[in-house]
Regions:
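C-terminal cap of metal-dependent C-N hydrolases
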Residues: 23, 359, 369-407
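Histidine-rich, glycine-flanked metal-binding segment
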Residues: 3, 12-19, 24-64, 403
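Divalent metal-coordination and catalytic microenvironments
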Residues: 23, 41, 60, 71, ...
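Active-site gating loops and adjacent loop-to-helix segments of metal-dependent hydrolytic enzymes
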Residues: 92-103, 143-168, 211-253, 295-324, ...
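Divalent metal-dependent hydrolysis catalytic cores, especially in the metallo-beta-lactamase
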Residues: 73-76, 88-117, 129-143, 168-179, ...
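His/Asp/Glu-enriched, well-ordered alpha-helical/loop segment
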Residues: 238-256, 273-286, 292-374, 378-380
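Alpha-helical scaffold segments that flank or form the walls of functional sites
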Residues: 61-62, 70, 80-130, 151-166, ...
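Active-site core of metal-dependent hydrolases
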Residues: 165-295
Length: 407
């Protein structure tokens, strides 16, 4: 049972109670003034007429599906790579940014240590934002980026098996580079049981990328970031590589760090056009690091040493060499950036942080929408799209005003 920031016993919601939530409901492409009814942590009815039970009235505030972050390393002063205690703290903090589910993203460690560390994280009992699997950013990468030398490893079938086992009962979701030698022997193992496999940190050719997709890779994380062009082969001819192969394939989804630095908004607009008709969609992630959500300052990030933020929401950079090292973005700010920068309406922007990530994970039959049969994971936003409340499995986990208007 997850804890609630609503402390008064008379305001606790027992899971067996039927209760309705009223406000400006947003689900899929619709905004309507209405209700949805919750029982046992599940939405059982959605409509515009009163359901005849106790109602929590959100007034003129928006009620949206909960946000899902597919790529996050840390927040505030906490870093997943510091261990279970920091992971537990992150789960408690994320609801204030509207995040109801996430993939804790683990940086690579030396062989042997990585599986032991992952097993410690997986057995941790947490309260707050729901863990939906573990995202392993490495070690099967071609380009290190800010992850250090541990991100580089040759194909190792035994290592993959051990990491998959260590993550249980969760899924181990690997980010790999299609241009790692022998990766074709690993992708089918990683993709077993319909587990998504991501690609990133790559300068792969079109053929290498297409082969990875054929073997089961269906998503590209922090797209464009650490996706350099292959070497120019013909003077005057723009080289094509992983970016173009991914954009051309309607089955592959992508995610972006929409902070205004990692990627130009025009590139996100281009992906929205390319991905509008296929099964592959566009998502937003934070790739957040220690310091995200806090005022500018310097923080310590594992092997990178000290990192700094020039302004709130900015990318993290190594103090030593100015290398990009994740971001200071939060999911609510990513949503606001999408509305302000991408020329899309609020329902469309919400899909980038809720339904589309759920589709990537294959859980869109019960997460990502406010619809009958779905988990009661939702966020209450004010007119400025600031997070006022976050509910997970039908319970209020974060409440900025510490009050609930019951009728």
């Amino acid at each position: 049972m997850r804890s609630s920031h609503v402390n008064k016993k008379k305001e606790d919601i027992r899971m067996n109670d039927r209760i309705a939530v009223k406000g400006l409901v947003i689900s899929n492409d619709e905004i309507f003034r209405g209700y949805f009814t919750i029982k046992d942590g599940t939405i059982i009815e959605v409509g515009e007429s009163s359901p005849g039970c106790e109602v929590i009235d959100m007034g003129d505030q928006y009620i949206t599906p909960g946000f899902i972050d597919l790529h996050i390393h840390g927040i505030h002063t906490y870093l997943i790579d510091n261990g279970p205690d920091d992971l537990s703290a992150i789960c408690r903090i994320l609801p204030q940014y509207g995040v109801t589910g996430f993939l804790p993203t683990v940086a690579p460690r030396p062989k042997g240590e990585d599986a032991l560390f992952l097993a410690r994280l997986a057995e941790m009992k947490t309260a707050g934002t729901e863990i939906l699997g573990f995202h392993l950013e490495g070690p099967f990468l071609r380009i290190t980026g800010a992850l250090g030398a541990g991100a580089i490893s040759g194909a190792d079938v035994e290592r993959v098996h051990k990491l998959i086992e260590a993550a249980k009962p969760f899924s181990a979701i690997f980010s790999v580079s299609p241009d790692v030698e022998g990766i074709e022997n690993l992708i089918p193992l990683m993709a077993a049981n319909n587990t998504p496999v991501f690609m990133t940190h790559t300068a792969a050719s079109v053929k290498e990328t297409q082969k990875a997709i054929e073997l089961g890779v269906r998503h590209a994380t922090h797209f464009y970031d650490v996706f350099p062009c292959p070497s120019v082969l013909e003077p005057g001819v723009r080289p094509c590589g992983a970016v173009e192969a991914i954009l051309a394939d309607e089955t592959v989804s992508v995610d972006f760090i929409l902070d205004g630095v990692h990627v130009d908004p025009v590139a996100v607009k281009m992906a929205l056009i390319n991905k509008q008709n296929g099964t592959g969609k566009v998502c937003l992630v934070t790739d957040a690091n220690v310091g995200a959500g806090l005022d500018p300052g310097e923080f310590t990030f594992g092997n990178m040493g000290d990192i700094s933020f020039a302004y709130k929401g900015a990318p993290a950079r190594s103090v030593k060499d100015n290398t990009l090292a994740g971001s200071g973005l939060t999911m609510d700010q990513a949503l606001r950036n999408a509305v302000n920068w991408l020329d899309i309406d609020l329902p469309h922007a919400l899909k980038l942080v809720s339904l589309h990530p759920a589709q990537v994970l294959g859980i869109d039959h019960h997460k990502g929408l406010l619809s009958a049969g779905y988990d009661a994971d939702f966020v209450v936003l004010n007119n400025d799209l600031g997070v006022m409340q976050t509910w997970i499995n039908g319970k209020c986990i974060y409440n900025k005003d510490k009050q609930i208007n019951r009728k």
